[in-house]
Regions:
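Positively charged n-region of N-terminal signal peptides that target proteins for export
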Residues: 1-4
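Beta-propeller folds
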Residues: 7-8, 12, 16-17, 21-413, ...
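Conserved beta-strand segments of alpha/beta enzyme cores
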Residues: 150, 252, 436, 516, ...
C-alpha cells in the first residue's frame, strides 16, 4: 500500500488557447459508445462477523486467484471481460492515446546521462540510449576522461521479460564486485546476484526472495541482506551470505518476531558499521556491527522505546541520532561510539515545533539537514567546527529541494536536488564553506517548453476545524478563473509521505490543453510537520478525506472550476482517498482516476496473509479492536458504496500487485456496477503482466499516462 516519482517527457505540439478554449470545453459532451454492455460479476455472498456486526461480501470469490482457490480461472475471465469492456469503450480514443504517448515521448531526451558522483576512486553514472527503456550503469576510474566500464546494461538483462526491475547496486570495498537485485514478476521479490567486474562473470551465488539490496562487509566476501516471507512478503530475517556458499548455508543474524515491524540492513556513511533497523510506524530499534568483523554478533544501539523513533549515522568517532524522543518534529543528538544507550545522548539540534527534521548528511566539517517549515522543504547547513549555520535560498512559492547522494565525507561540497511545478529536475553542487552553488544538470524538456508560459500559486483552503490546507497550483497562462476551467486535483495523504511540488513533463499534456493541476497537501502526509501526519491516521483518518473535499470546494468557490469540470486522481493509499471522497461527495467531481486503489480496508486489514497487512496496524488500525473496526468500516470505500449516482471513473490495477492486491479494485468496480445509478462511465483496466508500480520501462509507463489522460480529456470533449 506504499509509495516514487517518475520524471517524464515532452510535446511536439504547442497548443494555443483558441484551440482548447474553456468555453468550447463546456459546450459539448463526449459521446461514449452506447451499445456496449459492461460485465456483470457473479454474486457469491460470504458473511464476515466481528464485534457483533455482520458484513456480506458478494465478491469475495475474486480473492481466489491470489489464494489459488477454486475460482482462480473465473477471476481471470472476469478481469479479461472488464478489459474487453474498457477497450470497447475507449476504442474511439485509441488514436488520441497514441498522439498523447508520442508527444509525451517527444519531450524526452532519449540519449541522456546522469551527473557522475565520485566514490572510492571511481566516477559512477548511468546512461540512457535512444529507443531503450532501461539504464546502463557505468563508471570511469580516477577521471572523467578515462575509458568507460559498463557495469550493467539493464536493457540486455530485460530482454524476453514483460516486466523487469533491477535495484540495489552495491560495489564491494575493493571495487571488484557488484551485487544487485532483479525482479521479473513485479512482486518485489528480488534475486540478488554478484558480478565480477574484472572478468565480467556472473558468480554462481543466487539469493532468492529478498528486498534486492545487499551490504558488503570490508572483507569483500560477506554480504548481508533482507529475506522476505514468501507469502506475506514481509521482511522478516537479516541473513549473512559468504561468496561461494549455497543460499541454504546463509546464516540468520536477526529474525523479526513482531510482524508489525519492517526490517532492513544498511551501513553508515563512514562504512565503518553495518546497521540493522527494525521499525514500526511508532517505534524503532537499531543494531550495529563493525564492517571489519562481520562474524561478530550485532549489538543493540538502544533498546526500543515506546513511541520513539530514531535513526543514526556515524562520523568522527561518534554517532549522530535523529529522534522524536520528547520531540514530535525530531531533533538531532550525538553519542560516543562506545556509549550508545539513550542516557549518553547529547542534544546537538534542539526540537522546534515549527520545523520538521526529515534527515541529515554528515561531512568532515559540516552537517546538511533536510528540514520542512510552513509546508516547504529547506536545506540547513551547520559548520560542526564553529556551530555557524545558514540555509540555502529558494525563491518559488512551491518547490521541492533536498540533499542528494553524497558518498564523500572529506569535502565541503554538497550535492542537492531542486524542482518545482515549472522547474524541471535540477542537480546542483553547493560549496558549504564559500556559500556558492553551481548548476550541474537540469532535466531537458524538448518540444518548445518555456517556463515563462506557466504560472504557479500557493493557496490555502480552510477546513471545518479551522486548519489551513495548503495547495500547490500550476496552469498555463490564459487559464480563466471563470468557473469553467478544467482542474485535476491530486492527493495522497498517508504514511507521512509529503507530496511536494515537483515538475512533470507528462503533465504538460494536460496544462497545454487548458487544465490546471493542483496538489492538495492534506493531512496524513507530513508537509506541515509530524502532527500533520498524526492528524491524518488511525482515528483521525477522515481528516484526509475532508481536507481533500475542502480543497475541491475552495477551487469551486474561487472560480477555478465547477463540478462539471473538476477531476481527481490518486493511487494506492491515494486510491483509498479517491474511493472515500466519491462516496462522501460524488457531486463534486466529473471524473476520477484511481490507480491501484486500496479500497477494501476491513477485509485487507483483517487478513494477515495479505502482504504488508500487519506492518500497517498503526497506520489504519487493527480490525480485531472493536473501536478500530467500526471507525475503519465508517470510511472503507468498498463497504460504503451506496445506491446513488457516481462520477465517471477509471480504475486501474495490476494482476501481480504485491502492495494492493488486484481483487480490491476488481471487487470495488463490481459493487459500484451493482449499486450506481445514472449513465456515467465506469472502467476497470487490469494490466495482466505487472504489479503495484506499473510498467517497468521509461516508455511503457507513458502508455499508462496516455490512457488516463485520454479518459479525462475526453470528458472535456478534448480528443486531439
Amino acid at each position: 500500500m506504499k509509495k516514487c516519482l517518475l520524471i517524464s517527457l515532452v510535446a511536439i505540439l504547442i497548443l494555443n488557447a483558441a484551440s482548447f478554449s474553456q468555453t468550447n470545453m463546456s459546450d459539448q459532451k463526449y459521446k461514449w459508445p452506447e451499445n456496449v454492455k459492461p460485465p456483470v460479476a457473479e454474486k457469491k455472498p460470504k458473511e464476515f462477523t466481528a464485534h457483533g456486526d455482520t458484513r456480506v461480501d458478494n465478491y469475495y470469490w475474486m480473492n481466489d486467484y491470489f489464494k489459488k482457490g477454486a475460482d482462480s480461472a473465473k477471476v481471470v475471465s472476469y478481469l479479461t471481460a472488464e478489459n474487453n469492456y474498457y477497450k470497447a469503450m475507449m476504442a474511439s480514443t485509441e488514436a488520441f492515446q497514441e498522439k498523447l504517448y508520442n508527444e509525451m515521448r517527444a519531450r524526452i531526451k532519449e540519449k541522456d546521462e546522469s551527473v557522475p558522483y565520485f566514490k572510492n576512486g571511481y566516477y559512477y553514472y548511468t546512461r540512457q540510449v535512444e529507443g531503450k527503456d532501461y539504464y546502463i550503469y557505468a563508471r570511469k576510474k580516477g577521471t572523467l576522461t578515462a575509458s568507460e566500464e559498463i557495469l550493467l546494461d539493464v536493457n540486455q538483462m530485460a530482454e524476453g521479460f514483460n516486466y523487469f526491475s533491477a535495484t540495489g547496486f552495491s560495489i564491494s570495498p575493493n571495487n571488484k564486485l557488484l551485487a544487485y537485485g532483479t525482479d521479473s514478476k513485479s512482486r518485489r521479490q528480488y534475486v540478488i546476484r554478484v558480478k565480477n567486474l574484472e572478468t565480467g562473470e556472473i558468480l554462481k551465488d543466487s539469493i532468492t526472495n529478498t528486498e534486492g539490496q545487499a551490504v558488503w562487509a570490508n572483507d569483500n566476501k560477506t554480504l548481508f541482506y533482507t529475506a522476505k516471507n514468501p507469502v506475506t512478503l514481509l521482511s522478516e530475517k537479516i541473513k549473512k551470505h559468504t561468496l561461494g556458499n549455497a543460499e541454504s548455508a546463509d546464516v540468520v543474524v536477526y529474525e523479526e518476531k513482531d510482524p508489525t515491524n519492517y526490517i532492513g540492513v544498511g551501513n553508515t556513511k563512514s562504512e565503518k558499521y553495518i546497521l540493522i533497523v527494525s521499525q514500526a510506524t511508532l517505534s524503532s530499534e537499531l543494531r550495529y556491527v563493525s564492517a571489519d568483523s562481520p562474524d561478530q554478533p550485532f549489538v543493540v544501539f538502544q533498546p526500543r522505546m515506546k513511541e520513539v523513533l530514531y535513526d543514526i549515522d556515524h562520523a568522527d568517532n561518534q554517532f549522530y541520532i535523529r529522534t522524536n524522543k520528547d520531540a514530535k518534529n525530531f531533533k538531532l543528538m550525538t553519542t560516543p561510539e562506545n556509549a550508545t544507550s539513550v542516557e549518553n545522548w547529547k542534544e546537538f539540534i534542539r526540537h522546534d515545533d515549527k520545523v520538521l527534521i526529515q534527515g541529515f548528511d554528515v561531512f568532515k566539517n559540516f552537517l546538511a539537514i533536510n528540514e520542512r517549515k510552513d509546508g516547504l522543504t529547506q536545506v540547513h547547513i551547520i559548520n560542526t567546527k564553529t556551530n555557524e549555520s545558514h540555509f540555502l535560498a529558494f525563491d518559488e512559492p512551491s518547490y521541492a529541494a533536498g540533499v542528494g547522494y553524497n558518498p564523500e565525507f572529506d569535502t565541503d561540497v554538497i550535492r542537492f536536488n531542486y524542482t518545482s511545478l515549472t522547474t524541471p529536475a535540477s542537480i546542483y553542487d553547493y560549496d558549504m564553506s564559500k556559500k556558492t552553488k553551481k548548476l550541474l544538470k537540469q532535466q531537458d524538456v524538448l518540444g518548445g517548453f518555456n517556463v515563462k508560459d506557466y504560472v504557479t500559486e500557493r493557496l490555502y483552503a480552510t477546513a471545518a476545524d479551522g486548519t489551513k490546507i495548503p495547495m500547490s497550483v500550476v496552469y498555463k497562462k490564459g487559464f480563466k478563473k471563470d468557473g469553467k476551467g478544467p482542474v485535476m486535483l491530486y492527493g495522497y495523504g498517508s504514511y507521512g509521505a509529503s507530496m511536494d511540488a515537483s515538475f512533470s513533463s507528462t503533465r504538460l499534456s494536460l496544462l497545454d490543453r487548458g487544465f490546471a493541476f493542483v496538489i492538495a497537501h492534506i493531512r496524513g502526509g507530513q508537509e506541515m510537520g509530524r502532527y500533520w501526519y498524526e492528524d491524518g491516521k488511525m482515528f483521525k483518518k477522515k481528516n484526509t478525506f475532508t481536507d481533500f473535499i475542502t480543497a475541491a470546494e475552495y477551487l469551486i468557490k474561487n472560480n477555478f472550476t465547477s463540478p462539471k469540470h473538476l477531476y481527481a486522481s490518486g493511487g494506492s493509499a491515494g486510491g483509498l482517498l479517491m474511493g472515500a471522497v466519491v462516496n462522501m461527495r460524488p457531486d463534486l467531481w466529473n471524473g476520477i482516476v484511481a490507480q491501484v486503489p486500496f479500497v477494501d480496508v476491513i477485509n485487507t486489514m483483517s487478513d494477515a496473509s495479505i502482504p504488508l497487512t500487519t506492518n500497517e496496524y498503526d497506520e489504519w488500525g487493527n480490525p480485531a479492536n472493536k473501536e478500530s473496526y467500526y471507525y475503519m468500516k465508517s470510511y472503507s470505500p468498498y463497504d460504503n458504496v451506496e445506491k446513488k449516482n457516481y462520477p465517471h471513473m477509471l480504475i486501474t490495477t495490476g494482476l501481480h500487485d504485491s502492495q494492493v492486491q488486484y481483487f480490491e479494485p476488481a471487487k470495488w468496480v463490481a459493487k459500484l456496477r451493482e449499486m450506481k445509478s445514472g449513465n456515467n462511465v465506469l472502467l476497470l483496466h487490469t494490466d495482466m503482466e505487472v504489479g503495484h508500480g506499473g510498467a517497468s520501462g521509461r516508455f511503457k509507463v507513458l502508455k499508462d499516462r496516455a490512457r488516463e489522460y485520454a479518459f479525462i480529456l475526453a470528458l472535456e470533449n478534448i480528443t486531439q
